[in-house]
Amino acid sequence: RRLDESAEILMVERGPYVSFANCGLPYHVGGSIPKESSLLVATESTFREQFAIDCRTQCEVVGVSTEHKTIELKNLVTGELTTERYDKLVLSPGAAPIRPPLPGIDLPGIFSVRTVPDARHMRQWLERDQAKQSGMDQYTGFQTVTRPQRAVVVGGGFIGLEMAENLIKR
């Protein structure tokens, strides 16, 4: 926006939120930040009203034509496909958490925390009847019906350390 105040800018985000405090996610899981909405920094309307940026959440780029300078977008809620033209294209596809190929890595009670919905899912799992809400009653291996007492945090970066700190509070 600083380079050209009149440029048409389109920002596409696959998830439901455009801008959130990812360092606050562990504190939301731990209860220090009780309201999920407190994690949100800016909304679609904030980008539109303050920065004149057309921001589309729950939308995914499913095709790029460099020859025609167009992108094909899919609305993840409605399934509708649209085509938009561009002069300059900036790719910022984000990241995905690394899930090591360990036996049981996809069982209930194993979480990645990178987005607001990830933190919501973990917090809900911690606060509800784990056996029924998580689907653990469908497994024949180790099952828990009591509140979890132990946790393992894989990753010693800021988020991992803050997650360990906040799980102690639970």
Sequence positions of predicted segments:
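FAD-binding core/adjacent interface of flavoenzyme oxidoreductases
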Residues: S45-A151
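Conserved active-site region of classical short-chain dehydrogenase/reductase
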Residues: R120, E162-E165
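Residue-level marker of alpha-helix boundaries and capping positions
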Residues: P34-K35, V113, V154
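Beta1-alpha1 glycine-rich phosphate/pyrophosphate-binding loop at the start
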Residues: R1-E60, E165-R170
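Hydrophobic/small residue at the entry helix of a nucleotide-binding pocket
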Residues: I159
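Short, hinge-like loop/turn segments at secondary-structure boundaries
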Residues: P26-G30, D129, V152
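Cofactor-binding loop segments of dinucleotide-utilizing enzymes, especially the Rossmann-like FAD-
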Residues: V12-R14, T115, G156
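Glycine/Thr-rich phosphate-binding loops of Rossmann-like dinucleotide-binding domains
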Residues: S19, R99-P100, E162-M163
